Structures are given as structure tokens and as C-alpha cells.
A protein has these predicted regions:
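Loop/turn residues immediately N-terminal
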Residues: 142-145
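A structural signal for short, well-ordered beta-strand segments and their strand-loop junctions
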Residues: 136-140
Length: 214
């Protein structure tokens, strides 16, 4: 893992030389390496296009930036997803550009509790990631959060059914509103701050990261 000094230097160079989201990917990947046990793998899927090879990574709403997988997972073309294969997805990382304002916990809770008719954009991506991957690191390089969906067999079955319905509907050339099919379902999650400012709280931040269980 990068030292605090190395991380600060890289953040400064990003600001100075190439202020784009993708610059954070290797830094974030380095920070989360200690969370990967011998049985886990991290893969970059942000550049994938929606296809049968990528359906399981797209899930409900989008491709996250990094996914955490069981090492025994093997990707292949799929027109439907079996729950046994889905469970080999252990989590994901959603990275936003440096210092981008992250969606607050209050806004996420309000969206879910009010069952808004439609959700799009970053909110739709984040809630879709949470439901599909169950565990999400959400960061802008300074602020770091860890969202975790409570295990519940009923919602698991619903989510996989909705994704398979999305695949079928889109293959027929039609659009699909996944949120409309899930918004009335009951689910709980936690939203934990790993750090509001990882540079100012480095030691505590590193400690919390190392405690993450995928």
C-alpha cells in the first residue's frame, strides 16, 4: 500500500497534470489491495461495453470501475445469469473524479424510502451497484465510504430476476426500467465512512480499509 506521503504526492500531481477520474484508479486499487484475501481477485471493468460477455458485470444499472470476484469465477457469454454465478461477485468500487461531491447518505436514504418513480444518473448507478454487488467502496480520492447491503434471500432472488428480465427486454430492442421493478421491495443497507478526509485521517483510514470483508 502507498504511504501517506506517496499518496499525497500522487494527488498533487493529478491536480497539477491530469485532473481526470481515471488517474485515481491505480491509487484506489493500491489502497484496497490489503482487503483481497487469497481467494479474491480485482478486475477493471469500467471500459466494458454491454454485451453477453459483460452482462454479469453490468448488472442492474452500469459497469462499476473495479469489481471484486472469487478467483474461481470465469467470465463467459451469458443471456441469463444463475444465482450461483452471481454470488461469485463479491463487491465493487465506484470511483468519482478527485474531490467530486459524492451523493450523501441522506439523499440515498430519501430516494429509497420515498420509492421515487425513476432514478437516473449517478444515483441510479450507485443504488444499482449496491443492489447488484452488495458491497461498494465509493470514493473521490479524499472521501471514502463503504456501503453494504444486508443479506436477504428474497431480495437476492428479485434482483437476479430483474437483471435477467433486463437482458431479455434489451435483447428484443426495448428499453427497461430496472428501478420500477425493485423500488417497492424491502431491503436494508449500511453506509459507513471510512474517512471524510483520508489525508487528514490517514492512520485511522488505513485501519478501517484493512478491516473490510468482501
Amino acid at each position: 500500500m502507498l504511504s501517506k506521503e506517496e499518496y499525497i504526492e500522487e494527488i498533487g500531481l493529478i491536480e497539477k497534470q491530469n485532473y481526470v477520474e481515471v488517474e485515481l484508479y491505480p491509487l484506489v486499487a493500491d489502497i484496497i489491495n490489503p482487503t483481497l484475501k487469497n481467494s479474491l481477485s480485482k478486475r477493471y471493468v469500467f471500459g466494458r461495453r454491454k454485451s453477453n460477455m459483460g452482462q454479469i458485470y453490468y448488472g442492474l444499472s452500469n459497469f462499476p470501475d473495479i469489481v471484486i470476484l472469487d478467483k474461481n469465477y470465469q467470465n463467459k457469454a451469458r443471456k441469463s445469469i444463475e444465482i450461483e454465478e452471481w454470488k461469485k461477485l463479491r463487491g465493487c468500487v465506484e470511483i468519482k473524479s478527485l474531490k467530486h461531491d459524492l451523493i450523501t447518505e441522506e439523499k440515498i436514504k430519501s430516494t429509497i424510502s420515498n420509492s421515487f418513480e425513476h432514478i437516473t444518473g449517478e444515483m441510479g448507478q450507485l443504488i444499482g451497484d449496491l443492489l447488484w454487488y452488495k458491497k461498494v467502496i465509493y470514493t473521490n480520492g479524499i472521501e471514502w465510504r463503504f456501503l453494504s447491503l444486508d443479506d436477504k434471500e428474497e431480495i437476492d432472488n428479485t434482483i437476479v430476476q430483474v437483471v435477467n428480465k433486463r437482458i431479455e427486454t434489451e435483447e428484443a430492442g426495448n428499453s427497461f426500467d430496472w428501478w420500477k421493478n425493485i423500488k417497492d421491495s424491502s431491503f436494508n443497507y449500511t453506509d459507513i465512512y471510512l474517512s471524510k478526509d483520508c489525508i487528514q485521517e490517514w492512520d485511522e483510514f488505513v485501519k478501517k480499509v484493512k478491516e473490510i470483508e468482501w
